[in-house]
Structure formats: C-alpha cells, structure tokens
Regions:
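Conserved hydrophobic core element of enzyme catalytic domains
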Residues: 2-79, 89, 115, 127-173, ...
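Long, charged all-alpha helical bundle/coiled-coil segments in cytosolic proteins
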Residues: 96, 122, 131-135
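Acidic, serine/threonine- and glycine-rich low-complexity intrinsically disordered segments
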Residues: 195, 206-213, 217-224, 234
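Short loop/beta submotifs within extracellular cysteine-rich repeat domains
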Residues: 90, 105-106, 115-121, 198, ...
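Short, recurring structural edge motifs at helix starts
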Residues: 91-99, 203-211
C-alpha cells in the first residue's frame, strides 16, 4: 500500500536523488583520472562530466584544498535542496543526518579551544552540514554546564546532553567521554525514529545504525586500553543497540586486550572477517562493505 501512495510526497525528490546518482563519476571517469599527471589535468578530465563547473572559477594553480572545499559545497547544496523541499517524515530524517556533523563540530571547537587553537581556523574547519547559529560561542565555554546553558540549549543536541553533566571540566578525557555519550544518545534516538517510520526505512536504517553502534563500541573498547577510563565508565558509553548488544557489549566492557576483543566480535557471523588484516589502526575506518557482504 505504501508503494501506491509514495509518489504523492516522495516521487519528485526520488527523481532528484536519481539524478544526483546518475551524475556521479563512472568507473571510466575514475580510470581517466588515474592518468592525470597534475591537478590541471584533473580539472580538464572533470570538465567533460557533471562536475565540469564546480572548479571552473578556481584560479590556477589548483590546490587540493580547493577541490575538497568545492566538492563539500556541492554536496551541501544538493543536500539542502532535498531538505528544503522535503515534507515529514523525510524532512526530519534528513535533519537527523546532520546531527552527527553537529556533534563533530562541537567536539572540534571545544578540543581546539582547550589546546589554544585559533578560533577562526577552527570555525573554518567545521562541516557546513553541522553548522548552527550559536556554534562560534563554543569557543568561550569553560565547563559542560556553561556549554549547555549558553550554546546548546536551543539546538537539537540539547536532548542528548542529559547524561553529560557528570563531566564538569573540559579536559581531553572528559571531552572524549562527552563525544561518545552524545553519539550513544544520537544513535539510539535516530534508530527509534527510523523504527517509528517502519517499512524499508526501518529495515535498511536498522542495519546501518546497528553497524555504526557496533563500530563505535569496538572503537571505544580499543581506545580505552591504557587510559584512565574505568571499565564501568566504558560500558556506559556503549550504545544500547547493535548486533553485539547486549552480550557482546557486556563482554567488551570487561576486555583487557585486543585478542579478547577479536574473539568477542568474531562471535557475530557478519563480523568474522573484521580483524582479518590484524590491524588495530584499521578498526576506526571499518567500512559498510562488511554489511554488503552478508
């Protein structure tokens, strides 16, 4: 029944998204890019694609930072067009996608400020999808309560800060604890929202968000080895969802070394090849190919 009425509210934007997909670079385009000897060659190769205009006004010599900046602006422009034309529940879904960027921007600013980084440089590094009006004021916050009261109370992140007030001082360890508490609350909230929509959204996003929750649980476990973070506090940072939850989470909360983590994670069939390269460094960038393989 849902399919019969989908086009009433979603048909136009689905067509827009399909257009975005069709404009993406093809394997042939990427093969041509591998033959480029410099960035001007890259600009010339892109000129024959749908990306032909996004570097047209960039002066020579072309810089890699300019390419990254223009590509980000293109992504943001296309995303904002979708959000501006969406109706509920799609509009709310797209809002949720920006919350992770907000969290990253908040942590970037308070960490950079703690270490005396230039405010303007920090603001320039913030992702546009995570921008909100009071973001610059984060640079003067000295504790969690002030951070919430003066900056975040009017943002969507305010609901996720309820469990953060035990960390009153903004030092490196507490900032990392705040980051993980925010992500825990965000992922659980996003998952509940997707389940409330039901249908393909609940099914597809359930898989993706469960994987993201497990990835964060694994990262928190490994990164806490050799730190002042207690096992009890570590367990509180784990999202209450995912294929590892609850048994795997409980076991990871007690783990002391990587081999134990590996054994626990490999108990989940989808994750048996996760540690194949035996690389701790690779865990932080685990890709969703592990989902597609199953």
């Amino acid at each position: 029944m849902e399919g019969l009425t989908f086009n009433i509210n979603g048909g136009y934007l689905e067509g827009v998204v399909r257009g975005y997909k069709n404009s993406m670079l093809t394997p042939t385009n990427y093969q041509a890019l591998t033959q480029c000897e410099n960035l001007e060659d890259l600009r010339m190769q892109l000129s024959a694609t749908d990306y032909g205009n996004f570097l047209a006004n960039e002066p020579s010599p072309l810089a890699t930072s300019a390419i990254a900046h223009r590509a980000t602006l293109k992504l943001v422009s296309e995303f904002e067009y979708l959000r501006d034309n969406a109706t509920a529940p799609l509009s709310k879904f797209l809002d949720y996608l920006t919350y992770s960027y907000m969290i990253d921007n908040v942590i970037l600013l308070i960490t950079g400020t703690l270490h005396g980084r230039d405010t303007h440089e920090l603001l320039d590094r913030c992702h546009p999808l995570g921008w909100f009006d009071t973001l610059p004021a984060l640079c003067v916050a000295t504790n969690v309560e002030e951070l919430y009261r003066t900056v975040l109370v009017e943002t969507p992140l305010s609901l996720y800060f309820r469990d953060c007030f035990s960390s009153s001082d903004l030092d490196d360890l507490n900032i990392e604890i705040i980051r993980n508490k925010l992500y825990k609350a965000y992922l659980e909230d996003f998952a509940n929202f997707c389940q409330s929509i039901g249908g393909p959204t609940a099914e597809s996003m359930g898989e993706l968000l469960a994987f993201e929750a497990d990835r964060r649980t694994i990262n928190i476990t490994i990164n806490s080895f050799g730190t002042l973070l207690s096992k009890t506090e570590r367990a509180r940072l784990f999202p209450s969802m995912g294929k590892l939850f609850p048994g795997g989470n409980n076991a990871l909360a007690k783990a002391d070394e990587l081999d134990q983590v590996k054994g626990i994670v490999e108990s989940v069939p989808e994750y048996r090849r996760l540690f194949d390269d035996n690389s701790i460094a690779g865990i932080g960038s685990v890709s969703y190919t592990h989902l597609r393989a199953h």
